[in-house]
UniProtKB/Swiss-Prot annotation:
The lineage of its organism: Bacteria, Pseudomonadati, Chlorobiota, Chlorobiia, Chlorobiales. Keywords: 2Fe-2S, Cell inner membrane, Cell membrane, Disulfide bond, Electron transport, Iron, Iron-sulfur, Membrane, Metal-binding, Translocase, Transmembrane, Transmembrane helix, Transport. Residues 85-178 form the Rieske domain. The gene is petC. This is Cytochrome b6-f complex iron-sulfur subunit. [2Fe-2S] cluster binds at residues 124, 126, 142, 145.
């Protein structure tokens, strides 16, 4: 079907010699060609909008997740560091036994061996397992990898690289008092 009216295609116009010469592809009348004017610019409207929507989505996600995570993960308790602390009554550790207490940020095992109290770190120096007093073997033992220590934390055998950290211990007013050595 043929076009009716005053429509003339650019190709026909140039062959008939009427009107201005057709603009080359990509050129903007009265300015630079499109390729030249946007050289080095690498974004389009769609890409720009995608980045804006993505950024808004990220802000919404973070602002929603932050309070949820704060609610689920409890705040760390701040431990007041002291030089000396009464950890419990002297009757807690009868002769031939040992008991673990919290002292500052460490766990301490207090051992009563023949009426003599000693206190050492209850954390094995090998991999950080909790040690215990082995009454039958008369020593401090680590259940994880078989580390063995004397009552005062010295190495007997096992894979541990260092002896247990020592603390001072005394009985004062019927209470066991542990202090930094």
């Amino acid at each position: 079907m043929a076009q009716t009216g005053n429509f003339k295609s650019p190709a026909r116009m140039s062959s008939l010699g009427q009107g201005a010469a057709p603009a080359s592809a990509g050129a903007v009348t009265g300015g630079k060609p499109r390729e030249e004017g946007l050289k080095g610019v690498d974004f389009e409207r769609r890409g720009f909008l995608q980045k804006i929507v993505g950024g808004v989505g990220a802000v919404v996600a973070v602002s929603t997740l932050y309070p949820v995570v704060r609610y689920i993960v409890p705040p760390a308790k701040k431990i007041k560091i002291v030089n000396e602390l009464a950890v419990g009554p002297a009757s807690d550790v009868p002769n031939g036994t040992g008991k673990i207490y919290q002292f500052n940020d460490d766990k301490v095992i207090v051992v009563n061996h023949g009426g003599s109290l000693t206190a050492v770190s209850a954390i094995c120096t090998h991999l950080g397992c909790l040690v215990h007093w082995d009454e039958a073997a008369d020593m401090i033992a680590c259940p994880c990898h078989g580390a063995k220590y004397t009552q005062d934390g010295k190495i007997i055998s096992g894979p541990q690289p260092l002896p247990l950290k020592q603390y001072k211990v005394k009985i004062e007013d019927g209470k066991i008092v542990v202090s930094i050595a």
